[in-house]
């Protein structure tokens, strides 16, 4: 009798042990398939646009209702951009090509200030179209590197006829180009190639950086965004500091940090489309006086790439995976993120000895 009881207890113990093993294995597999990505970079480097692309590429995208919610942001971005361009004319000593536009500008500011932000009234649109067509305004816009202007300004102002329609609903591209400063930490979840991603987007402005520490533990990889087009611009929060130099300093501190000794670093040299246009008229020596190469896209972009990759002090241990990106181009981001996912899978297999 005692032998039978003992055998039953042994079976129960063995079954309990198997259940624990199964639970541990399942937890291990779940942990192995969970990827934490920290999205870092200086302000206005395109991080939030990358997050929006993940929703478009790996989720259901933006529903019609969600797009409608962005209408106010599109209107606000468009109106504010034109205000900034016209205000800059005074500082740049640029006159309106048509003197009558001075009064139109005054009317525009009066109407825009009185109107509810995020509403585009027909009378404001009419004034905006006249101002945007003015040669002086276009001259000020062409010199936007000399002041702070959203990258999306030209895109929205050139689309005034479309976005002013009464039944206007922002497109996915319109949503991608909206600009709202990120404060705090935005967490986004999505799946790709059997991996479950948690993407953390943190505020890029200097005042936000002290909050990053909460995301550090257990991060699989860092995506560091740099605006290639920022080489001839200064920071919004410090007009003495060149944006590219600030990005280099920040990358140096992240790449060589004790927190990230084992962490893969993926470098997105972003806004390649803006850089390709800008490098034709604005030399790289503005940022790097020692540069002796040509002001062509390939040579200038490679030089910037080298400047970042050379900051890596652990080349024997840590590889920097660099990609040229255009965050507003969904196909480009999809292609690049596929490559990023493959790197993460390879590194995961290495860690468990299968690669």
From Swiss-Prot:
Cellular component terms (Gene Ontology): apical cortex; apical plasma membrane; cell cortex; cytoplasm; heterotrimeric G-protein complex; plasma membrane
Name of the protein this chain belongs to: G protein alpha i subunit
Region entry G4 motif, spans: 266-273
Molecular function as annotated in GO: DNA binding; G protein-coupled receptor binding; G-protein beta/gamma-subunit complex binding; GTP binding; GTPase activity; metal ion binding
Keyword check for Nucleotide-binding: yes
Gene3D superfamilies hit by this protein: GI Alpha 1, domain 2-like (1.10.400.10), P-loop containing nucleotide triphosphate hydrolases (3.40.50.300)
Region (G2 motif): 174-182
Primary subcellular site in the record, as a coarse category: membrane
Effect in UniProt of substituting residue 205 to L: Inhibits interaction with loco. Does not inhibit apical cell membrane localization in neuroblasts
Gene: Galphai
PROSITE patterns in alphabetical order: G_ALPHA
Chain intervals for the UniProt region annotation (G3 motif): 197-206
Upper taxonomic lineage: Eukaryota, Metazoa, Ecdysozoa, Arthropoda, Hexapoda
Protein's organism: Drosophila melanogaster
InterPro entries with a match to the protein in the record: Gprotein_alpha_I, Gprotein_alpha_su, GproteinA_insert, P-loop_NTPase
Keyword line: Cell membrane, Differentiation, GTP-binding, Lipoprotein, Magnesium, Membrane, Metal-binding, Myristate, Nucleotide-binding, Palmitate, Transducer
